[in-house]
Structures are given as structure tokens and as C-alpha cells.
Curated annotation (Swiss-Prot):
Protein name: UPF0340 protein TTHA0583
NCBIfam families reported for this sequence: TIGR01440 family protein
Gene source species: Thermus thermophilus (strain ATCC 27634 / DSM 579 / HB8)
Entries under InterPro entries matching the protein: Antibiotic_NAT-like, DUF436
TM helices/strands, residue ranges: none
HAMAP family: UPF0340 (MF_00800)
Length: 196
């Protein structure tokens, strides 16, 4: 389990290095502990593996002031575990259900047991700024547009494939639009007074 914890920690640290999430941002985690242990999703939930993943992933995110949502499995319609303050901050609707390893999954159950004041919410309303998918459980529905894959050097947590994504604001405008501060400043040069 120590290897799982270390891999999760490295993944979180690398994620935050590639995409420095601001305090108050929302991170979504989805995962299958069965896949982490080399089994097919849903066949071998493990609270021990779930705790190892969370022990690695949560500290770097929480130290940065990032809100974390942990997705439950399809038996709970992919509802998520969040802190009550996260639900309030993002206007999320609480639902009346408690996860357990066979309905919700081990990762959501472990998060519910670990969080200070956990609640289940139906959806993130596509407000997550970034996230990780451990084992191909699909988190895209929770991410803001536009999702951008992040390629991390940590490719697996245990035996589960690790996918990560950040998001960026939509690019708007037409032929005259610019998309970086540097481009904007260059365009301004023609409007600045010329020295005599």
C-alpha cells in the first residue's frame, strides 16, 4: 500500500506543478480500487487501497486550499463526496445517500469517512477546474469546459491507468483576437506615443 500512496502523492505534486490550482479551485477525483489492485472495475473494492490513494493525493491539494470532490460509482449515479463548505461554495445540491464499497465504491467511502463534514452531492454542475481518473471511471462530466489532458510521468497508480486533466477558459473572438498577455502588449505598441 505504501507504493500506492507514494505514486498518488507524486501524481498530485506533479499535477500541481503542471497546473498550479488557485486556492478555492475545485479538483475532482474518480477511481477504482479494484483497478488499482489489478482487477476489473467493481469486482474487488478495497478500503485499504482507497485510504492509501487519499493519503497520497489529498495533502498536496488541501495544503494549497483546493476543494476536493470524490466521485462515487455508477450505482449512485456518479454522485460525489465533498465537504459541506465545498457544496455551499459551489452551489451544489446535497442528496440523501451514504456510500459503501458496493454502492459508491471504496474511494468515495474512504473519502466520506476521512472528510471533516462530508455530504453527498448529485453533481458538480461541470465546475471542476481539474481532476484525475484512476482506472478509467470517467470524470469528464464534472469538468468545466475546456478540458485539456495533462500527461504526467506517473502513468499508473498500482495497476490502474492514471489520466489527468486541467481546464482552461474558452477562447472567444475572431480574427483580431489575441490569447496571451504578451500578444496583447505587442498589439498595444502601435498605439503608444513614438519618441521624437
Amino acid at each position: 500500500m505504501e507504493g500506492i500512496r507514494r505514486a498518488a502523492q507524486r501524481a498530485a505534486e506533479e499535477f500541481l506543478q503542471a497546473f498550479p490550482m488557485a486556492p478555492g479551485s475545485l479538483f475532482v477525483l474518480g477511481g477504482s480500487t479494484s483497478e488499482v489492485l489489478g482487477e476489473r472495475v467493481g469486482t474487488r473494492p478495497s478500503l485499504e487501497a482507497a485510504h492509501a490513494v487519499l493519503e497520497g493525493l489529498l495533502p498536496p491539494l488541501l495544503e494549497r486550499g483546493v476543494h476536493v470532490a470524490v466521485q462515487a460509482c455508477e450505482h449512485l449515479n456518479r454522485a460525489l463526496v465533498v465537504e459541506r463548505e465545498t457544496a455551499r461554495a459551489f452551489g451544489l445540491e446535497e442528496v440523501a445517500v451514504f456510500p459503501h464499497p458496493k454502492a459508491g465504491g471504496a474511494l468515495a467511502t474512504a473519502a466520506f469517512l476521512r472528510f471533516r463534514d462530508p455530504v453527498m452531492v448529485e453533481s458538480l454542475k461541470a465546475q471542476a477546474h481539474g481532476g484525475m481518473d484512476i482506472g478509467g471511471v470517467l470524470i469528464g462530466m464534472h469538468l468545466r469546459p475546456v478540458a485539456v489532458p495533462l500527461r504526467l510521468s506517473v502513468r499508473k497508480i498500482g495497476e490502474a491507468v492514471l489520466l489527468a486533466a486541467k481546464t482552461r477558459p474558452k477562447l472567444v473572438g475572431g480574427a483580431r483576437a489575441v490569447y496571451t498577455r504578451e500578444e496583447m502588449l505587442k498589439k498595444l505598441e502601435e498605439f503608444l506615443p513614438k519618441p521624437p
